[in-house]
A protein has these predicted regions:
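Conserved short alpha-helical segments that host acidic/polar catalytic motifs at enzyme active sites
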Residues: 1-149
Length: 149
């Protein structure tokens, strides 16, 4: 089952998110990832396998600087377990990161709509469509964009 952890504060986010994800390991998952905002851009790291793989990749979160972020453990429902299909998913500009728990039943027509508008998809997941929809609807007000999505 998927797990989601988020953090906004004054401490470095990545180690806190990794700790939070470790508390969800008992639920089962096939991959893990996180997105950390460093004040200028969003950096993501994703890995198939146990959380330890992501911890090693990020040196316990030490090489992902920033005080806000999201993390996710994934149990695949759309798309095979892979680094690309792991969450978080980004919009094409790399300015929006999304994690999601559940199934988007109508993601195929939504994906087609966004592809017709020029959005490029790299994963096989239903969640990636959310990042592109948020990008499409965002006009300066995040709550308005989320409501429209």
């Amino acid at each position: 089952m998927c797990g989601i952890v988020g953090y906004i504060g004054t401490e470095q986010a990545a180690p806190i998110i990794l700790d939070g994800l470790s508390k969800l390991e008992y639920r089962g998952y096939d991959s893990a990832g996180m997105a950390i905002f460093d004040g200028e851009k969003i950096n993501t790291r994703k890995a198939v396998g146990r959380l330890k793989v992501l911890e090693n990749l990020t040196h316990g979160g030490e090489n992902m600087k920033g005080t806000s972020g999201i993390g996710h453990t994934r149990w695949a429902t759309h798309g095979a377990p892979s680094d690309i299909n792991s969450h978080p998913h980004m919009n094409n500009a790399g300015t929006i990161a999304v994690v999601h728990n559940g199934i988007i039943e109508n993601y195929i027509p939504l994906k087609k709509k966004m592809q017709d508008k020029g959005y490029q998809f790299i994963s096989e997941t239903d969640t990636e469509v959310l990042a592109h929809l948020l990008d499409y609807y965002y006009k300066g007000n995040p709550l308005e964009a989320i409501t429209k999505v």
